[in-house]
């Protein structure tokens, strides 16, 4: 069969939009639960109403996250399914991964090394995202730990309200 002549071809207009095909939609709410990223104990609890003592810094201040004890090299697991939004390095919390878990909620994991995820990657709950590493100088007296922060629309939320009881 001969190829159609240009005059016989139909014009097709494609809108200037990127359509995400088969991209999961994540949902998180006040009724959702989070898996513990590591098995350790809480070293420094969440408190935005009162100050708590930070041994290394020798100061009292609010804490927008929880700091969970860990062993160096221990796998750090994703607490919920989501998409990796950002990977960055912070003087206080070291290498960190921010994961959007849906409906304006984000989880930040800090004090990581040997990351196993990349930006824009979709991850399931329980997936290894990295490994606990020696703490930054801001947490040297607290020891090796994982910094674990939950945000809703950019504001810190107490992750203990969502973590599944051990």
Across the structure, where does each feature detected by a protein language model lie?
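Short, flexible surface segments
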Residues: 38, 72, 80-81, 93, ...
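Short alpha-helix capping/helix-loop boundary micro-motifs
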Residues: 69, 114-117
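Conserved, short, structured surface segments that act as functional micro-motifs
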Residues: 121-166
């Amino acid at each position: 069969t001969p190829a159609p002549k240009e005059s016989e071809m139909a014009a097709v207009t494609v809108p200037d939009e990127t359509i995400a095909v088969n991209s999961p939609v994540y949902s998180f709410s006040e009724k959702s639960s989070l898996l513990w990223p590591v098995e350790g104990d809480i070293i420094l609890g969440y408190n935005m109403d009162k100050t708590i003592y930070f041994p290394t810094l020798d100061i009292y201040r609010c804490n927008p996250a929880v700091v969970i004890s860990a062993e160096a090299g221990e796998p750090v697991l994703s607490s919920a399914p989501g998409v990796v939004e950002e990977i960055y390095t912070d003087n206080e919390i070291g290498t960190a991964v921010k994961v959007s878990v849906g409906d304006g909620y984000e989880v930040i994991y800090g004090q990581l090394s040997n990351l196993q995820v990349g930006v824009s990657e979709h991850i399931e709950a329980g997936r290894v995202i990295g490994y606990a590493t020696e703490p930054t100088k801001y947490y040297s007296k607290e020891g090796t730990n994982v910094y674990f922060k939950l945000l809703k629309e950019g504001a810190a939320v107490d992750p203990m309200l969502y973590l599944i009881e051990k």
